[in-house]
Each structure stands twice: as structure tokens, then as C-alpha cells.
Amino acid sequence: MGIHGLTKLIADQAPGAIKEQDIKNYFGRKIAIDASMCLYQFLIAVRQDGNVLQNEDGETTSHLMGMFYRTIRMLEHGIKPVYVFDGKPPQLKSAELEKRGEKRAEAEKMLAQAQELGEQENIDKFSKRLVKVTKQHNDECKKLLTLMGVPYIEAPCEAEATCAALVKAGKVFATATEDMDGLTFGTNVLLRHLTASEAKKLPIQELHYSRILQDIGLTNEQFIDLCIPLGCDYCGTIKGIGPKRAIDLIKQHGSIEEILENIDSSKHPAPEDWLYKEARGLFLKAEVVDCSTVDLKWSEPDEEGLIQFMCNEKQFSEDRMRNGCKKILKSRQGSTQGRLDSFFSITGSLSSKRKEPELKGSAKKKQKTGATPGKFKKGK
């Protein structure tokens, strides 16, 4: 889910913290990618006649096709992706997961009704609401990445938290995800739309956390205390407090405790036994991979292994797989050239003194939405 309304709030309050970029500008960059978010995108978007792609055995293959071709696209642009997979969800997320289960049950009812009435538009809509990333999807994509020579990490808990830790440790340049809570976990740079379909022609949004804090005038702790009332995955919100009021209150009072002391609780009641302190603690000290043990390596693809898995087992076209391998090998030759700025320390911040380019497209529009050891795998 991420943080409700945070994208629009940042676009309104700190537009200078958002840059729109082309994928070619990330040549030579190592980027940590929220794998679950990608798989969800692929299962929603990679479809034929409104249905997920399947092989002759009835096995879903949308996630594999999406992972294969989108990863190759990044490699061809000189990007070095590392995928981060979710581990066990935190206990605080159980209420949110329960809500999602209820929504799925409702979507199943609506889908059955739409199928009975032959309403194709609603069939497509409710089918997408039932999309769920499974352990099998994850395991198959991990196998595919290993065969492609692309590293992945199994986070001990939330993938976005481990992505942020990798950025803060200097292992990668940015976190790529659509969930804005990557910022709440403290990633210095967050990229949106990096793994979106090329057909959508969405510019990549690059958000700089230090500039957001600077322009809004908040500390890291205050930003977290802003995000919790906006709505996150770990606890409820204060009734009747929207994004504009939330930012005014946090600027005025500095913390959730002080806000609760100073608002009219009869008009704006907080949830009973509100777990905001626990949510704050999770954002501040998330369970993440031990970054000192992470050694990222990108290697040559195992072409015959790919053919065995993707063609013999999953029934993909052998010509397309071999052509994909050629593209990976060619990209490895091109990516040996480094970035000039790799010789210098990169802080990931934007200077507020220089004039920012005028935003266009989605960033300009008012949007409606807004260390414990882990398991590390690399391409063999």
C-alpha cells in the first residue's frame, strides 16, 4: 500500500525534490528493485485477452515474461539491477493483510457476478484485483534471475526496508518501487516507474529524500510522524485528518504525541490502542539484511540453463530466449565503461540553490495517490 497521498503531498510541498528522468540516465547505476512490486505489475500488465499468460499446462507465465524482458531492458541501458524479495511480514502488518483478504473475498463475489452478466470490463477489473504474488512466482523468478546472471537478495522482512538500507550503505544508488514508504524507511533516492511498461512511456520519477526534508522543513523522525497519520501498512489513522492538516499539525507540534495532546479528540479520535509508536519504531529500526555481508556480482547468463527452464519446462520460444541471452551478453560488454561520477562520493541530494527544470507530465499533475542477516543470492 505504501503511504496514502504522499506522492501528491511531495509534489505540492517539495516539487524541487522530484526530477523526471529518462532510463538512459541511469547507465552504470546499481539499483535495488522491490521484487514483489515488479511481480505484481507483471501479473497485472502482461496479459492476453484480459487473462494472465499461461503455458499449455495451465501454468501462469506472465511474471517470467515480465521479469525476463524488463530486466533485459535495464541491462541494455547499462543499469545493474539487484532484486530484493520480501521476507516474513512484520506482525504489525497483520491487520492490513486481513483487510486485503476481505477485499479479495469481495472482489471474488463481484467477479462471479460480472461473469454471470457477461460484463467484460468488470471481469477484467475484478480479475486484476484478485492478483496475488505467490511463493511459486517468487521462487521461479529467483531461478530465472540466477540463470540470467542477475543478483537478488532475500530480505528478512520488508523488501523496501532492505532496499533503503542498501542505498544508505552505498551498495546501490537508489530504490526502485512504486510504494512511497521506501522514503519513510529512509532511502536517499527513490525511483518510480523504472520497471513500468515501455509502452506507457512514463518518465522515471526520481525523488530525493534529503531535499524533501529540506523543502518541507522536517527532520527524519518528523517525516515518519507525518507518514503514519497519512496512512501506512502498520496502524490506523486519526479520523478527519487529511494530508494538508497532517503536515500543518506536524510542523506546528513536531510529533504525534504533541498532536494528540493538542487536537480535539471528540472531533478527531485516534484509533483505540493506536500502535503509532510501534509503527514509528519499525520505520526507524527496520529488520534488514546485514549490508556488510552483501557482495553484488553480475555474471554471464547460463544460456543452456535458461533454455532448459524457460523453454523445456515453461514452453517459451527458444529463439526468443537465445536472442535475449545475446542481448544480455552484449549489455555486459557495454557496461564495462563506468560512470564518471563513480569516482566521486555521491550524496544523492539536490541543491536548492539551482533552478529546477519545470516538471511535466505526472509530476506536474495533482495526483490522487499517493540489521539482521538475510539471505543473499547472486548470479552463478
UniProtKB/Swiss-Prot annotation:
Subcellular location: Nucleus, Nucleolus; Nucleus, Nucleoplasm; Mitochondrion
Region I-domain: start-end pairs: 122-253
Region (Disordered): 351-380
An example Gene Ontology biological process: base-excision repair
Signal sequence interval, chain numbering: none
InterPro entries assigned to the protein according to its UniProt record, in alphabetical order: 5-3_exonuclease_C_sf (IPR036279), Flap_endonuc (IPR023426), HhH2 (IPR008918), PIN-like_dom_sf (IPR029060), XPG-I_dom (IPR006086), XPG/Rad2 (IPR006084), XPG_CS (IPR019974), XPG_DNA_repair_N (IPR006085)
Cofactor note: Binds 2 magnesium ions per subunit. They probably participate in the reaction catalyzed by the enzyme. May bind an additional third magnesium ion after substrate binding.
Location of region: N-domain: 1-104
Positions bound to Mg(2+) 2: D179, D181, D233
Residue runs in coiled coils: none
Chain residues that bind Mg(2+) 1: D34, D86, E158, E160
EC number from the UniProt entry: 3.1.-.-
Listed cofactors: Mg(2+)
SUPFAM superfamilies in the record: 5' to 3' exonuclease, C-terminal subdomain, PIN domain-like
Chain residues that bind DNA: R47, R70, E158, G231, D233
Domain of life: Eukaryota
Region (Interaction with PCNA), start-end ranges: 336-344
PANTHER family reported for this sequence: FLAP ENDONUCLEASE 1, FLAP ENDONUCLEASE FAMILY MEMBER
Assigned protein family: Belongs to the XPG/RAD2 endonuclease family. FEN1 subfamily.
Subunit structure: Interacts with PCNA. Three molecules of fen1 bind to one PCNA trimer with each molecule binding to one PCNA monomer. PCNA stimulates the nuclease activity without altering cleavage specificity.
Name of protein: Flap endonuclease 1
Source organism: Anoplopoma fimbria (Sablefish)
